Amino acid sequence: MAVEKVNSSSSLAEVIDRILDKGIVVDAWVRVSLVGIELLAIEARVVVASVETYLKYAEAVGLTATAAAPAV
């Protein structure tokens, strides 16, 4: 995947359209500990994409019901 560099400014609508078209994943992992005792652990994965984009990539990795169901 190539990175495109554009010198002109983009409107908010163009940025949102691009994010929904390509999708974005934010993966976070936080651990809070005090004196070696873990007090809090948070693990999160946030996916922002259009339904069409999500289904295209989810089916490719077997996350949809049609991809997981055995063929009869």
Curated annotation (Swiss-Prot):
The record's principal subcellular location, in a coarse class, is: other
Keyword Glycoprotein included in the entry's annotation: no
**UniProt keywords, alphabetically:** Gas vesicle
Cite a single GO MF annotation.
structural molecule activity
Location comes to: Gas vesicle shell
This chain's function reads: Gas vesicles are hollow, gas filled proteinaceous nanostructures found in some microorganisms. During planktonic growth they allow positioning of the organism at a favorable depth for light or nutrient acquisition. GvpA forms the protein shell.
Q: Which PANTHER family match?
A: GAS VESICLE PROTEIN A1, GAS VESICLE STRUCTURAL PROTEIN 2-RELATED
Family stated for the protein in its record: Belongs to the gas vesicle GvpA family.
From the Swiss-Prot or TrEMBL record, give the protein name.
Gas vesicle protein A
| Species this protein is from | Synechococcus sp. (strain JA-2-3B'a(2-13)) (Cyanobacteria bacterium Yellowstone B-Prime)
